Amino acid sequence: MRIVLQKVSHAGVTVTDEAIGELDTTFTEQTIAAGYVLLVGVSDADGTRQIDWLAHKISNLRVFEDEQGKMNLSIHDVGGSILSISQFTLFADTRKGNRPSFVRAGKPEHAERVWLEFNEALRAQGLQVKEGRFGAHMNVSLVNDGPVTILFDTEELGI
């Protein structure tokens, strides 16, 4: 799995109905105050081991400032929330040509299942998690706080 974590002061996501180019009224805008936006990419090799490791790491990561201005507090400590967005493009291969290849991204059925299980694993850690819609064209807005942006790649980490 590949995750781009962004610490935010607030964020939101809407879904666009591609057929008419307007907001999809069947999707309620999801918003959070302080917390994380997670852009989540899944490969076919990802499963329970990666889900559990990432959920534990992200829920305990200390990137919020304490009274002394030191990054010493977790998302639990500040009562933050998570906005989780599936994003297969994190597995783009740009080594050849000018059009990225996405062959390393997980097949949609597998990727959706892993993404949803990951979100549930975060909830099991006691976190409030809001979601975009898998496979949809989404408009994500956020205010990056810091900025703090951290990349997780379980393959690179050997997990």
Curated annotation (Swiss-Prot):
GO molecular function, one term: Gly-tRNA(Ala) deacylase activity
InterPro entries linked to this entry: Daa-tRNA_deacyls_DTD, DTD-like_sf
Enzymatic reactions: glycyl-tRNA(Ala) + H2O = tRNA(Ala) + glycine + H(+); a D-aminoacyl-tRNA + H2O = a tRNA + a D-alpha-amino acid + H(+)
One GO process term, biological-process aspect: D-amino acid catabolic process
Short sequence motif named Gly-cisPro motif, important for rejection of L-amino acids, residue ranges: 146-147
Quaternary assembly: Homodimer.
Name of the protein in question: D-aminoacyl-tRNA deacylase
Species: Bifidobacterium animalis subsp. lactis (strain AD011)
Lineage, highest ranks first: Bacteria, Bacillati, Actinomycetota, Actinomycetes, Bifidobacteriales
Gene (UniProt): dtd
